[in-house]
Amino acid sequence: MKVGQPVLQCQTNSEAFGMMQERRSGNYKPNIWKYDFLQSLSSKYDEEKYKTQAERLKEDAKHLFIEAVDLQGKLELVDCIIKVGLASHFKDEIKKALDTIASSIKNDKSDAIKNRYVTALCFRLLRQHGYEVSQAKKSDFLDENGTFLKAKSMDVKGVLELFEASYLALESENILDDAKAFSTTILKDINSATTESNLYKQVVHALELPFHWRVRWFDVKWHIKTFQKDKSINKTLLDLAKVNFNVVQATLQNDLKEISRWWRNLGLIENLKFSRDRLVESFLCTVGLVFEPQYSSFRRWLTKVVIMILVIDDVYDIYGSLEELQHFTNAINRWDTAELEQLPEYMKICFKTLHTITGETAHEMQREKRWDQEQTETHLKKVWADFCRALFVEAKWFNKGYTPSVQEYLKTACISSSGSLLSVHSFFLIMNEGTREMLHFLEKNQEMFYNISLIIRLCNDLGTSVAEQERGDAASSIVCHMREMEVLEEEARSYLKGIIGNYWKKVNEKCFTQSPEMQLFININVNMARVVHNLYQNRDGFGVQDHQNKKQILSLLVHPFKLD
């Protein structure tokens, strides 16, 4: 069966119908993003004249690096460029500016940076770009007694930047841990009546989710609108950011239209009514990983992977009987169509679709990236088999009514979260010219992928546990901790949020020290953790297509900026 052609139609009989009566339901709402609407998307910003306009504005904006002569000016320019989504356009200029800053700080033994806001901003930007920089010195934020300065001794911008910087902490950086606690307390006490409105909105935004944990592209519009109210921000830079956003959005619309045609022609969801039909949400996840226009192929192929993750997850979580799941897991492990005879029709459809997508992905990676097709397919089949085995373990827990310890839960969850599955697919989809050295890099960074996978799982649990408990799903990490430690849900949630913070520290150890040629892949993996923070922040981003989800999709994929 070719992906893009209709899948087999389900056959039902009285016995199968009897089994269907006992099936569980996820109670997922129908898809709200209809095919005709997606195909109607169009943008004038894919015209060449807007790309030319962006190039002209880009050349004009380069002068800003020359005009920014002092340390604070350089730092704020770099920060603004990153936040409005223009970092890829000014890579060389940003590197040159940060190289100069890092060198001047390293050679200056007089501790010349006295402005606490600048100290924190400098630390954050240097660390997130891979420069070796130690946690802020005690003298920068502590008084002579070794305690943090009182709120009245620090301006709001300084406290806010200290808060943001604290989220780039590594393990054992106790000063930054104290800085996070201190700045969080201060920011929560800030009154809107006594704080400039634009700054107050930034404080609220940061407390909802810190910048380091946010998906950069998802926040671009918010930052542009925020900077528009700041008279110190150069208008040319903001004009460029708006045009760039619209040009990128035009490419994303074309990507989405193409993948929606594939999805409709596939016909998979019509035969699997129990599963989530979430094409647009799946595509948006890939946009969160890498949004630049030149990565259209990556987004389209990885969207197919995300779609299959959702479908197979629903097979294990919601619909399949334990006996069926055993046969399905065996079939995936052996990757053998001979196993299909023991599978019900809906599982045959899942297996054949996955089999075809995986084969076509490996073939495409050989054509586009010069990876060995057989080698690629071997790696992809392995991560799918690992994923299904982990889901089967959780299905057995559910069927036995078993609640594991948190440690036992996480051992399986790091695989069932799909983090490693997405990492391996991303590796082959994004990296060029497969070599042993590159594959060694994949193996060498397993610890980072492991920590990102656990962030994915725990964020998922925090966002979906209420709905899962209502459905009677298997125990989440929240329930596991509640029962293991005999605590209430609120305490369990607080504990797991702390664990997420610790895993981020482990990720921080690895994600700022990679070589330039590997940095894109590392960024994609870190963005996986950021995407799930966005998806499951106070909601189930896949299960429920609520107002917040719809608003974000319309903003990022449908509505362009109005240009002056």
From Swiss-Prot:
GO terms for molecular function: alpha-farnesene synthase activity; magnesium ion binding; sesquiterpene synthase activity. It comes from Ricinus communis (Castor bean). It catalyses: (2E,6E)-farnesyl diphosphate = (3E,6E)-alpha-farnesene + diphosphate. Disulfide bonds: none annotated. The gene is TPS7. Catalyzes the cyclization of farnesyl diphosphate to (E,E)-alpha-farnesene. Mg(2+) 1 binds at residues 313, 317. Belongs to the terpene synthase family. Keywords: Lyase, Magnesium, Metal-binding. A motif (DDXXD motif) lies at residues 313-317. Its cofactor is Mg(2+). This is Alpha-farnesene synthase. Mg(2+) 3 binds at residues 464, 468. Binds 3 Mg(2+) ions per subunit. InterPro entries: Isoprenoid_synthase_dom_sf, Terpene_cyclase-like_1_C, Terpene_cyclase_plant_C1, Terpene_synth_N, Terpene_synth_N_sf, Terpene_synthase-like, Terpene_synthase_metal-bd, Terpenoid_cyclase/PrenylTrfase. The lineage of its organism: Eukaryota, Viridiplantae, Streptophyta, Embryophyta, Tracheophyta.
